[in-house]
Structure formats: structure tokens, C-alpha cells
Amino acid sequence: MSDTPFYLIDEARLRENMRKIERLRERSGAKALLALKCFATWSAFDIMKPYMDGTTSSSLFELHLGREKFGKETHAYSVAWSDDEIDEAIGYADKIIFNSLSQLDRFGDKAAHIERGLRLNPRFSTSGFDLADPARPFSRLGEWDTERLEAAMGRISGVMIHYNCENSDFALFDHQLSRIEAEFGDILKRLNWVSLGGGIHFTGPDYPLDALADRLKKFSDDFGVQVYLEPGEASITQTASLEVTVLDILDNGKKIAIVDSSIEAHMLDLLIYRETAKLPQQGEHEYQIAGKTCLAGDIFGDAKFEKPLEIGDRISIADAAGYTMVKKNWFNGVAMPAIAIRREDGSIDRIREFTYEDYRASLS
């Protein structure tokens, strides 16, 4: 397979993450729901389903996809449900989580036959970037006033608390969970379930997985609740690459390799959060790897190679599964990467191609 660009999902690496999730579930008793906002490539769901309990969503379409393609337990969350969405959402969901007391007041009766929850905002997080900080000033994400939370009791069976972001520090997780226990314990002990959301980087290298499992079990036992986690990035970290080809090489005081992809169109989160792509760093031949759109800052980052690059060379951009395929777009009309899976036997299945007809159909 030579046609680039394409996202290449590695089945063996994905299973490694899944086995860590399975180990955490077994030791802690917690349930794990795939966060579709991060990764929703449903052709990989058959690999993941044996190791996870279901999906959680942030919109009606994600919810529908989770029910249709993943099955098992399906949680529905949205910052705001609309009148023309709520009946369909309730039809797909096992649990529906409202973002605010006003949404619970408005739609709670419609959802009385399924489990209802509310988003609890503890007013702190591990995010170091304001754009992704649910505890930022004037946050619209969840309720934190105990009087408003009390007003929901009797109508909800659980809460969702999403406050971690790429948190690989177990001690910090432990400390912040203790704060939640101290401040909201009187409410938690009257619930049946608590989702601690995603953002816990427990599949990363050297993470103390058993310590996390034991802490989750203690939380569950102390408050008598079923714990849920919503791993997105933790499910798919280091499981895919974006495969690109060098189209041109420039030297404008710095060697630049232009590839057949775009950070704006194909790895947008890196641009948003001012991060560089994970590029090769072996060798003494250094190049800036740049995309092919007209955006001046369409730059993946600097890479090093053991020998000079040539037009036609392939480059693998690592860790390209999370928040990539769900955010890819048609900026400049640049060809959208195909999606492929490298199977455990080494074979590669090219599972989705995108064509001009897809581009045209996305417009009007």
C-alpha cells in the first residue's frame, strides 16, 4: 500500500492498551466507556469491545454511533440537548447525563424511564490550557453549587465529574479525588454511580495502574457507588500513525520538506494547542515538516533523519489516533487521509477512502 496520506491504526498496540483497561476494570470494579469525542473510528470497535463496557458521547450523532456500532452500555451527555434531539437521545441511551439543573428540569420527566445523571464541576482541573479547562472562570460545564445539586437529588442516580486532562500524575489524581470526597461526600453517598470522566493517562508508560485500581475501589466502597471511567486518549494513545509522503524540498535558510497532508486539516488539535507532531528524531539531517495548504503556519514540526530526504520518501507521524480522525476536515480541499488497520499478522486493511465526491457532498 503506497497511496498516502492515511491514518494507520496498529491492532497489536491497540490491544496492549485494551489489556491495561481490562486489568484496571478487573482489579477496581470500575467500568470503562470509550469517549467517542476522542476516537470514533468504528471499524476498530470489534477490537475494543471485549475489553470495554460501552461508550459515552457528547452529541446525538456520537450517541447514535455508539449504540449502533459499539453497543453494550451507552451513556448520553451533551452540554445542551435541544427539543428536537431529546426523544431520540433517550431512545438510544441507558443513562442520560444533563449538564445543568435547568436541562434536568426541562427534560428530566421525559427521561424518567432510564437512569438520569448530572454533571458535577468540582471547580478545579488538571488542564494547563485554558481552552480545555472545565474549571475556567464562568465555566458552562456542570453544576458546583451544593444547593443546586441538592435540588437534583431524588431525580438523578449519578453524576459525571470530568476534571482530568492528560493527567499522568497518580498522586495528583489521588489528591484531587480526596478533595471531591471531602466537599461533595454527602451527595456522593446518596448516589448509585459516579463517572470520573476521562483524561487519566493510565495506559502511559510506568503509570502505577494497580495503585489507581485500588484507589478507585476504595472510592467505590466508601460511597457505595459504581465507578465509571471514560478513557479516550488512554484507550488509543500510541496506537496509530499518520503516513505521509514528501512532495517537495525547499531550503530557505532552513531545510523544509512539504508533505501530502496538513496539520490544519488532519491533526488539528496540535495546531490548536500549539504542540508539535511526534516526528522521527534519529540522525543529523534536520528538516521542518510542513503541510501543503496555504496556511503559513501549516507546520508539523522539526524532524531528524539518518540520511537526506528525497521527494517520494515516506514519513510516519506518531501518536495520530486521538482527536484526529474525529476532527479531520476539508480545508483547502486537500485530500482527506484514508484509514487503515495493520492487523496482528502484519497485513494491512484499508478500510476507508475519501474522494472528491465526499468533499463535494460535505458542501452544498
Show the residue positions of the predicted features.
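Charged (often Lys/Glu-rich) extended helix/loop segments that serve as interaction or gating elements
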Residues: 226-364
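Glycine-rich beta-strand-to-loop/alpha-helix junction loops that act as flexible
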Residues: 35, 164, 194-203, 231-234
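Anionic group-transfer/hydrolysis microenvironments
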Residues: 12, 101, 121-123, 162, ...
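N-terminal capping/small domains of soluble enzymes
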Residues: 1-71, 77, 81, 262, ...
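Short glycine/threonine-rich loop-to-helix capping motif typified by GTGT followed
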Residues: 169-174, 203-212, 238-248, 304-305
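Active-site-proximal beta-alpha core segment in soluble small-molecule metabolic enzymes
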Residues: 30-193, 207, 215
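Acidic/histidine-enriched ion/cofactor-binding microenvironments in catalytic or ligand-binding pockets
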Residues: 182, 186-191, 211-222, 303-316
